[in-house]
Regions:
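N-terminal non-catalytic cap/leader segment that marks the start of a structured domain
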Residues: 1-98, 263-267
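Catalytic-pocket segment enriched in acidic/His residues
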Residues: 2-3, 56, 60, 116, ...
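Glycine-centered structural positions embedded in regular secondary structure
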Residues: 10, 15-17, 153, 175, ...
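His/acidic/aromatic-lined binding-pocket segments of jelly-roll/cupin-type domains
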Residues: 17, 124, 241
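Surface loops and adjacent helix of pleckstrin homology
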Residues: 21-22, 28-30, 113, 120, ...
Length: 298
């Protein structure tokens, strides 16, 4: 029996939607509120690949109406200094093991989110575009050669970080867990549709200007090694998210040459996990940008 094609999913006010590739969204006859809940049901993404379609709408009609695709995620793991380009620009030595942290799931937000910055606590909020992995099956004590088998999908993330809070507290979780600091989406792409798992591209733009452009081929700890390391200590469960690290080009990296580089100057930040060889798609939400706006692209 042929396996169903890996779906490309969004979440709307009318439930889960499947992108068709020709500008349409098939609204599915499924009871799940988001992709994490679908995965916790225990059948991977297959139900979304084969579900009956209630009706079809143009993707353009959902501009500004897409919801967080992983709102019910229970755990978000992150890793610091995991790109060679980031290590080079900061002058830091390569870590000998992944520098892991937890990001509160309550920090999550979705496409076209406007973030209320915690200005009474932090003046140094910074963007971090990342490729995010969505776990599909329970994972514990998993060897590297079996790690990818536990990944259901990938998506884009903006691991917003209050640099000054991290510095004064010594705690990455506190600096990364303010409400809205964990944007994911806008879409979730089934792993089977990823052409090259070892080189997933990432593009981050600020006010329309490219700031971060890299691929996971530059990771210090490639995905299988990263997942295997986490699973030595933790049971990763369906719907959990693992952020793979941010490349060079954050506001912090630019501070030496641009001392005024602060979030207050960022009208919008867009993170895109692009299909290999393709140009970034237009922003889903073409309205004038507002302070602190995050746009995650399909």
């Amino acid at each position: 029996m042929t396996a169903p094609e890996a779906p490309h999913l969004v979440v709307t006010g009318d439930g889960l939607g499947r992108l068709t590739g020709d500008g349409l969204v098939e609204l599915l006859d499924l009871p799940y509120r988001d992709v994490a809940e679908l995965l916790r049901a225990g059948h991977g993404l297959d139900p979304a690949a084969t579900a009956p379609v209630r009706h079809t709408v143009p993707l353009d009609s959902l501009t500004g109406a897409l919801r967080p695709p992983l709102a019910s995620t229970r755990a978000v793991w992150g890793v610091g200094l995991n790109y060679h380009c980031k290590a080079r620009i900061t002058g830091r030595p390569l870590p000998t093991a992944p520098l892991l942290f937890l990001k509160s799931a309550s920090a999550g937000s979705g496409p076209d989110a406007t973030v209320a910055l915690p200005e009474s606590i932090s003046r140094q909020a910074d963007y971090e575009g990342e490729v995010a992995l969505v776990i599909g099956t329970p994972m514990h004590h998993t060897p590297t050669d079996r790690a990818w088998a536990h990944v259901a999908a990938v998506t884009a993330a903006n691991d917003l970080t209050a640099r000054d809070v991290m510095a004064t507290s010594g705690n990455p979780t506190l600096g990364k867990s303010f409400p809205g600091f964990g944007a994911l989406g806008a879409s979730v792409l089934g792993l089977g549709a990823v052409a090259d798992r070892a080189a997933i591209p990432l593009l981050t733009t600020v006010n329309g200007e490219p700031r971060q452009q890299a691929s996971t081929a530059d990771l210090i700890f490639p995905v299988p090694d990263l997942l295997a390391w986490i699973s030595r200590y933790v049971l990763l469960e369906p719907g959990d998210v693992v952020l793979t690290g941010t490349p060079a080009g954050t506001g912090q990296d630019r501070a030496a040459s641009s001392p005024t580089e602060t979030w207050s100057r960022c009208r919008s930040v867009e993170c895109c996990r692009c299909a290999p060889g393709s140009a970034p798609s237009p922003p889903l939400v073409p309205r004038p940008a507002t302070p602190g706006r995050l746009v995650q692209r399909v």
